[in-house]
Amino acid sequence: ADKYMEDNPGVTVTLEAVPWGTCQDKVINLAIAGDPVAFSYVGSRTLKGLAENGHILETNIPASQKAMYQPGILNTVTHMGKTWGFPHAFSTKALFMNCGLLEKAGVACEGPQTWDELYSMAEAVTKNVDGAAGIGLAGKDFDNTMHQFLNYLYSNGGQVIDPMTNEITLNSSNTVETLEFYGKLANVAQEGPLAWERSQLTELFNDEKIAMYINGPWGRGQHKEGLDVKTVRIPAGPQGNQGTLLITDSVAVFSNTGVEKEAMELASIITSGDSQYSLDTDWGLTPIMQYPQIGNEAPYNEDYWMMFIDAIGDGGPEPLFVDYKAFQTVMNSMIQGAILGEGDAADLVAEAAEELEEYK
C-alpha cells in the first residue's frame, strides 16, 4: 500500500485491521448501509451473495496472473463464469497418521490408497489399541464439519453445485456413497463425533487418542514433539481420485465507492508476485501460485508439501451459495443424520439437495 501511494500521488490508502471473526459481517453490513469499504479480505464463500446483491465488482484478473494460479483455484471465486475476488489465501488437506499407534495395532504405517484400506486400518487401531480410536471425525455444528465431508466427496468424484451453470448436483451416487462411508467411519472414530470440530481433533491426535485425521498444512506445527507422524494423500473413494477440498479467502473490490479503479489495481498488486509469495510462506499455506514459474521453489519442494500440492488437480472448490450459512446448516444436518444413523443416506442426500435449491 505504501509503494502504491508513492507511485500514485494524491491517492491515500487507509488500512484497517479487523478481527477475522467479525471482518466479513462488518464489510457486508457497511455495503448494505451504502457506505462500502474500497476492498476487503473475505472468505471466498461470501462472494456469490455479495455479487448477487451488486455489492462487489467482477475482478479483472490479468491473463498472465490467471495462468499463474494452481489448477482449480479460480473455481473458488467463480460464479456463472465470472470471477468475483482475487484469491489470496489457500489451503488443501492431507491425512496425518500416528505411526506408533498404527504399528501397535499391527498395521504398516503406509498411506491408505482407498477408503476400504483406510477403514480397515482405523478398525485395527480401534480393536487392538486400548483407549485409542482409528480416526478423528468432525460432526459438530461448525463449518469444518462440512469441509471434512467435502474432502471425502471430492475424493469420490462428487460435487455440490456446478459453478458455471449454478445447478445443484449434490444428489448423485457419489454423494450417497460418501455419506454412507462418513457415517460408517463413526464406528472407528472417537466417541460422540457430534461434539468435535477439526481443531479439537488435533488435540486428540496429540493425546494419542486417534491414529489418523485430516488437516491442513499448518497441522505439522501443531503436533507435539516426539510423535512419529506421517503425512499422506486423502484416500480415493470407489468413484474418484485422491482429492481434497480447495478453500480460498480472497480480496473483493466493492462497488459504489468512487475509487473502484484504484482499489482494483491495488488488490491485484497485493495478491500477486512477491507480495503473495511472502504471505503464503509466512502463514504456512498451500501455495496459491505455481511459484517455480517465477523462480521461487522453496519451501514447496519438500515431500511434506507435495502431499498438499499434488492433490490440487483432483480437488474441488468450496461451493458458493448466496446464503452460505444456510448451505452449511443443510450440509451439516445431512452429515449428522448419517453419523447418528437417522435415515437412509439416499434420502438424506435427496432432502439436502432439495433444500439447497433455496439458497443457491
Residue ranges and their predicted role:
Residues 43-94, 99, 116-119, 145-148, ...:
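Hinge/lid segment of periplasmic solute-binding proteins
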Residues 57-71, 75, 111, 134-142, ...:
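Short, solvent-exposed loop/beta-turn-alpha elements that line the ligand-binding surface or hinge
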